[in-house]
A protein has these predicted regions:
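Gly/Gly-Pro-rich "capping" loops immediately C-terminal to redox-active cysteine motifs
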Residues: 65-103
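Short alpha-helix boundary/capping elements
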Residues: 58, 72, 132-135
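Post-cleavage N-terminal segment of exported redox proteins
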Residues: 1-47, 91-135
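Substrate-binding/catalytic groove segments of enzymes
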Residues: 61-62, 74-78, 114-118
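Sequence/structural segment immediately N-terminal to covalent heme-attachment motifs in c-type
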Residues: 42-69
Length: 135
């Protein structure tokens, strides 16, 4: 139920914004990011699909959880370099998902690493719904 409220809040935030979606490339928050990707997907985000996607290896060696943790509420460790990875869940890292440019770069790089392709808008929305619902 809390995730549904998060999704609805996110949609209201973007739909009532006086700025077009392209103007949201400034600093943002998790709710706005979810609304942007849900709108681009053209369908409601599903946090359960997002969790399954986040934890799956997709036929390769890594999953999102390989570096970000399972769940991604604490500090992770990059599977290849051993570098520290900040918590990804906005509830435990208020700076997470607060820059559209960084979110776009994060999805582009990590989807390519895990899937060997760009994530779809629906996959991004689902993952954001999952992350936003974590406490």
């Amino acid at each position: 139920m809390k995730t549904t409220a998060f999704i609805l809040t996110a949609l209201v935030a973007v739909l009532t914004s006086s700025q077009p979606l392209s103007a949201l490339s400034r600093d943002t928050n998790a709710a706005e990011q979810l609304a942007i990707w849900t709108a681009r997907a053209g369908a409601p985000a599903d946090p359960r699909r997002g969790e399954a996607f986040f934890n799956a290896s997709h036929g390769g060696q890594w999953s999102c959880a390989s570096c970000h943790g399972k769940p991604p509420t604490g500090t992770g460790q990059h599977a290849e370099t051993g570098k520290r990875v900040s918590p990804l869940a906005p509830a435990t890292n208020p700076k997470a998902l607060t820059s559209s440019a960084k979110v776009d770069k994060w999805f582009r790089r990590n989807c390519n690493d895990v899937l060997s392709r760009e994530c779809t808008a629906a996959e991004k929305a689902d993952v954001l719904a999952y992350l936003g619902g974590l406490k």
